[in-house]
């Protein structure tokens, strides 16, 4: 198969011919029809993820067709249209038994713990636990865009944030994660204030339903700006970027008993941000994480997509080839363009 491979961290990846994968007894091989390019892939490429063993094939936002099936798989057949969460569970540990596959003790992450989907084929483990069937009405590019950013935002807004209609949601960072959160919060009737330093990103946030926007590069104090707009602070606030400044602002702009959801990865030098803990204590704030979403929770999200309440295809910015994905991957830290980039030609 053709795949993108890097043999050293931060060294330019290259296209290479590799043997086609064979399925594990409990897994399947998926023919990749579309694959998102995500900032998490960039973090892996520069060496921020200790699970990665070199040489490595990145990629974790995928959709495709089942190509081969392991002997112990019960629920899937060759030809099934599928996607998969970027964090998969083993199905047998205490967390999986409790339904929390996204924090599995032995989690499987294509593109991190194993070779990923910047390739023609990818091996997916524990298929009966982790695969998600795709409706025929959902195209592969849109389905691939769900795999990391959209589902993580869905879990952040809906499951972790318990957001309800009429509440104020602040979204710090309007990349793929943040724009997904804007769309999801708007769909359930919340009022959204989007914060970014890019007017292009903020314009897209408004198109996707943001009630108000704040350009963090142009206001003197982001927290005060959000407090003014929301008349007292957000009920739920997300750091969708993963930076000490956005994390601090997201916690600080909450109203009493509000919830901060950390969605953006905090790695390397950003892994220990300052937290206004006195405010957390005095105002009884909650700090939560969102790390993917279980396969069994996809149904609620897919139902909203099929009903038209969510339109994730609006987030797709560019469709590129596997060859073009190398440059796109290496430039993910530059936050160029708007929306989600998806590989659709292999």
Predicted segments, located by residue:
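Glycine-rich beta-strand-centered segment in the early N-terminal region that forms part
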Residues: 19-35, 48-94, 135-138
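Short, surface-exposed secondary-structure boundary micro-motifs
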Residues: 33-34, 71, 87, 101, ...
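C-terminal hydrophobic helical "lid"/dimerization subdomain
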Residues: 1, 248-252, 294-346
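Glycine-rich phosphate-binding loop and adjacent beta-alpha segment
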Residues: 244-307, 345-346
């Amino acid at each position: 198969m053709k795949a993108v491979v890097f043999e050293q961290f931060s060294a330019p990846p290259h296209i290479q011919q590799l043997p086609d994968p064979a399925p594990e007894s409990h897994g399947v091989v998926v023919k990749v029809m579309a694959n998102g390019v995500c900032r998490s892939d960039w973090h892996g490429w520069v060496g921020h993820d200790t699970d990665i063993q070199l040489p490595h094939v990145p990629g974790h936002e995928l959709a495709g067709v089942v190509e081969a099936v392991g002997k112990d798989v019960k629920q899937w057949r060759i030809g099934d249209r599928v996607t998969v969460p970027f964090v998969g569970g083993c199905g047998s540990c205490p967390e999986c038994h409790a339904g929390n596959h996204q924090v599995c003790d032995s989690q499987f992450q294509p593109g991190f713990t194993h070779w990923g989907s910047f390739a023609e084929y990818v091996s997916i483990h524990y298929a009966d636990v982790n695969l998600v069937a795709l409706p025929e009405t959902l195209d592969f590019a849109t389905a691939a865009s769900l795999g990391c950013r959209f589902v993580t935002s869905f879990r952040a807004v809906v499951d972790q944030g318990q957001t309800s209609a009429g509440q104020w949601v602040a979204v710090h960072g309007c990349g793929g994660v943040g724009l997904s959160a804007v769309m999801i919060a708007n769909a359930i009737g919340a009022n959204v204030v989007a914060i970014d330093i890019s007017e292009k990103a903020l314009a897209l946030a408004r198109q996707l339903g943001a009630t108000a926007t704040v350009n963090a590069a142009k206001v003197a104090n982001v927290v005060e700006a959000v407090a003014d707009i929301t008349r007292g602070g957000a009920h739920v606030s997300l750091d969708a970027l993963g930076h000490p400044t956005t994390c601090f602002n997201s916690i600080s702009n909450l109203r009493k008993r509000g919830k901060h959801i950390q969605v953006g990865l905090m790695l390397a030098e950003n892994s220990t941000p300052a937290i206004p803990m006195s405010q957390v204590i005095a105002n009884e704030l909650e700090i939560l994480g969102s790390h993917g979403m279980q396969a069994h929770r996809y149904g609620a999200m897919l139902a909203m997509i099929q009903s038209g309440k969510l339109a994730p295809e609006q987030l797709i910015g560019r469709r590129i080839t596997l060859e073009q994905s190398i440059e796109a991957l290496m430039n993910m830290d530059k936050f160029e363009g708007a929306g989600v980039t998806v590989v659709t030609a292999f």
